[in-house]
Amino acid sequence: VARWFAEVPGGTMPWPDGAPGALLLAALTVAVLLTGRALAAGAAAHPVLALGCVLTLAASLVPTRTLTWPPQGWRVVVCDVGQGDAVVVRTGADSAVLVDAGPDPPLVDGCLSRLGVSTLDAVVLTHLHADHVDGLVGAIDGRRVGQLFITPVREPADSAAHVDALAVRHGIPVGSLSAGDRLTLGEMDAVVWSPWRRIADGSVPNNASVVLAVRTGEVDALLLGDIEREAAHDLLLRLRREPSMVQAA
């Protein structure tokens, strides 16, 4: 019981030792005894108010948990980067895989820093639209990066050239991912579900998004990039299990 009450908000407080502490406790005890009848009379006269006070006191005694960031044991975090995506998949104590980098370098850098990520085992750019790749420099500056993976459909061409230039400048090897490929990095295992062909209908870059079925710890996540109806139809025909989490544009 003592341990439980010690965990409630305000359950412990500084208290003077020795005679001063004893005198203070005695004074408080006398005050409670002298006001006890007045409190009882007040409760009888205003029962609703008295009940409200009791309920408020009871609620304050419920132990609370302090919210911290990052959450203990986090596995997958979707960064707030505004328009676009940046998903962090944990691979180790201070390492992760970044799937897309959003449009804003400071936003993705801040997200990774708050998660304590100093090493990116890989960066996967699902497709090459600006809202998924323009933040790349913020993710890779000042961090160890193992490899950069992109879709085999290198459109738009200017975004592809921008990504290539950043990779060369930072000495990061670049590869492409297609359906059937697999990534096993630390605590993460991922299977590539798409693209398996170039789809001319709809948005070619969107439908060429790298789709990852990710498992890290006990969490399954399906990261869809920006696939549209045509690629989604192909994906549904090939999907074999339901993930715990689905990320979609």
Feature-to-residue mapping (PLM):
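Non-globular, low-confidence helical/coil segments that flank catalytic cores
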Residues: 2-249
